[in-house]
Design a protein with these regions (language model features):
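Enzymes that bind and transform nitrogen-containing heteroaromatic metabolites
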Residues: 2-228
């Protein structure tokens, strides 16, 4: 098993970050079925100063006043880009590219912003670009080990949410299933291990939206995973 070494020399390192319910839901009808201010603050702290890579639908899910995400280079993948527009171009404060490979090639060539190093003793410092959604982008990135500039995703940062039993939180988009060392069954190969996780806390201002639109008290925990 490889141990995390915070003194390792800098090199391109790709991370993926998302929030999910304990049932794996990450979205519903093109948005997220929760309000989670603590997760938004955590997301900004982890990703600020680094390129963030997303699909077009993820980009469009952000309110216009929040696009592009500040203090980060925004790279948007749009499969409809063809022909003369196949090379990266800027629009609405973001770089637009036709594929995940093009996004990673662009991100791999970018220097980190001065405000990027905020976790000198954590694996977050290793990450030089983050994938932030949506489901198909996560799935492609996590299934490959030949990603341009990076090879593969090395770090995953995920936030878990749960609410009281009996309140159903529904969705139509799910987080990737991960073979985590601490939870695989006997004989199943593990791909990830837990580097750290926070204690469960109740959100002061956040909530989960159930199937009828009701607001339910929300509990959350942050978890960091690394490749084995």
């Amino acid at each position: 098993m490889r141990e995390y070494d915070s003194s390792s020399p800098a090199r391109p390192c790709l991370g993926a970050i998302w929030a999910q319910t304990d049932a794996g839901i990450i979205g519903r009808d093109g948005t997220m079925p929760w309000r989670a201010p603590e997760d938004l603050a955590h997301f900004k702290t982890v990703t600020v100063g680094k390129p963030v890579i997303m699909g077009r639908r993820t980009w469009e899910s952000f309110p216009p006043r929040f696009r592009p995400l500040p203090e980060r280079t925004n790279i948007v993948i749009s499969r409809s880009i063809t022909g003369d527009s196949a090379t990266p171009f800027e629009r609405d404060g973001a770089f637009w590219v036709p594929s995940l490979d093009a996004a990673l090639t662009l991100a791999g060539d970018m220097p980190l912003a001065p405000n990027a190093t905020r976790h000198p003793d954590s694996p977050h410092q290793r990450v030089t670009a983050w994938i932030i959604g949506g489901g198909s982008v996560y799935a492609e990135a996590l299934s490959r080990e030949d990603l341009p500039s990076f090879g593969r995703v090395e770090i995953i940062e995920r936030t878990f949410f749960y609410c009281q039993e009996g309140n159903e939180i529904t969705g139509d988009t799910y987080a990737p299933e991960l073979a985590v060392e601490e939870f695989v069954t006997a004989g199943e190969p593990a791909r990830w291990r837990i580097l750290g996780e926070s204690a469960w806390e109740k959100s002061e201002r956040g909530y989960l939206l159930d199937a009828s639109g009701g607001k339910n008290p929300m509990y959350y925990s942050f978890q960091t995973l690394a490749r084995l």
